[in-house]
């Protein structure tokens, strides 16, 4: 016990002092960033990064279409009138209904899509004139991992000029946001997402130990600080949503992603997950998206590629082990996002499960945020689970049965 306490104290000292010191160095651009990151809350979930000129990084905020930016509100649809959805004082439900009534089918579809960023799907780091001819001319729900310093899987890190310093990175994301606000019909901002289970996935951000390593500390205050730093660094870089924490409960050490969980105890996962989310979402700096819902970490034979769990777990195990952390983090920390999992349970893929993603998650657990699918999970309904006859059917199942963000 004494040895364990000494180990915990040493690890806590390393993280809470050295990492905090590094984080403070990371945040020395604060004064510049205050000028760059001018934000307003849009429909209660999208954090709006107001745009700037593309010629250089300005010292003072100066929008291109200045006529859009009124005193106390923004004319997102450029019609010269304050629509209900543009009125920050209007009830949120009224704003949503007004916006939906103005959206075309194409615009609604695009808001359900996540686009991988630079060098993964996007070929451009900053908007070009060609963007008005692309799919995202009607807007896009989210752009994931844009300019975080990584390219396509397996390739070396990007040497893009906007990766660092933080002020330049945030300016570049502002430019991307400017396109969606100023150049699309309704001006709906996009959500800049990134990974963050051991710090923000960015070339220069603080790199923490794995979740499994952090879980061994059993230190709530420490994890809260990790969440606080992760959220703060993400916000300084211009990201608005971080895919963390992982709330899976590790029960089979053969599983290839075991290092990503806090541990084998659902109580431990819940306690540390609560603190991580509270830290990340402190002062509305970013949204936290917990994953993977649900029963993902105990695949049959620990075979990740199979994406199947039945009949590995009984209903009681699912409820007491795997649902428990999500219930508590949603209710006690106000988790804003949930990522659905690849696996099936009892023969039904979670990705298209109305029972799990609507009846249980939104009904019984009281979740009021958004649900995003894991990468390729929609496609897996066709290619892996075989519950859809083609890709169109896979999309239909995902939308009609669970209403998720693809």
What are these model-derived regions, one by one?
Residues 52-405:
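Glycoside hydrolase catalytic-domain context in secreted enzymes
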Residues 1-5, 9-53:
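Bacterial Sec-dependent N-terminal signal peptides
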Residues 1, 405-406:
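N-terminal regions encompassing targeting/leader/pre-sequences
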